[in-house]
């Protein structure tokens, strides 16, 4: 169903801006109050541990000599432009799709800002079970994951118009 699109979908970009602001504020606080590599226990399964990631998710390509920073920044920018265009063409009634796109855009641009400013992304959220630690991540990464999840759920729940 395509109704009330374009201009009416643009306010969802303000939600992306909110995600960017929360991400950048959390990274500022992490850099201000945490020490690199020294975990601070928050809950039995959660630490805040400052980490600088020059790669992508799970530090993919993080040990390369620097080309990956430009590569991942470019991908973040291009994907964000594509998603903004998609958002502008999405029906205002498709709330789950709009929310998912907004979260992904905000997360991608939050990490894009880090790559441009510092040549790395600040990660600090460290989930663990005893001595097993999941990859350290940040608010932008969380927004991207939740956004992708919402898009998948939306696509699974929305009937296809094709026979």
Curated annotation (Swiss-Prot):
Q: Which UniProt keywords apply?
A: Aspartyl protease, Cell inner membrane, Cell membrane, Hydrolase, Membrane, Protease, Transmembrane, Transmembrane helix
GO process terms (BP): proteolysis
What enzyme class is recorded for this protein?
Answer: hydrolase
As one GO molecular function, the record gives:
endopeptidase activity
Report the catalytic activity: Release of signal peptides from bacterial membrane prolipoproteins. Hydrolyzes -Xaa-Yaa-Zaa-|-(S,diacylglyceryl)Cys-, in which Xaa is hydrophobic (preferably Leu), and Yaa (Ala or Ser) and Zaa (Gly or Ala) have small, neutral side chains
Which Pfam families does its entry note?
Answer: Peptidase_A8
Family listed: Belongs to the peptidase A8 family.
Which protein are we looking at? Lipoprotein signal peptidase
Q: List the taxonomic lineage.
A: Bacteria, Pseudomonadati, Pseudomonadota, Gammaproteobacteria, Legionellales
């Amino acid at each position: 169903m395509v109704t009330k699109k374009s201009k009416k979908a643009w306010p969802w970009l303000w939600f992306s801006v909110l995600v960017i602001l929360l991400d950048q504020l959390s990274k500022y606080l992490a850099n201000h109050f945490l020490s690199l590599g020294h975990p601070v226990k928050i809950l039995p399964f959660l630490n805040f541990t400052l980490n600088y990631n020059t790669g992508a998710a799970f530090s993919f390509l993080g040990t390369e000599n620097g080309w990956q920073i430009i590569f991942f920044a470019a991908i973040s920018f291009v994907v964000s432009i594509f998603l903004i265009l998609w958002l502008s063409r999405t029906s205002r009634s498709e709330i789950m799709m709009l929310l998912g796109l907004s979260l992904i855009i905000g997360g991608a641009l939050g990490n894009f800002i880090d790559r441009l400013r510092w040549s790395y992304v600040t990660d600090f959220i460290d989930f663990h079970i005893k001595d097993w630690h999941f990859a350290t991540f940040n608010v932008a990464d969380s927004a991207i994951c939740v956004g992708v999840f919402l898009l998948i759920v939306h696509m699974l729940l929305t009937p296809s118009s094709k026979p």
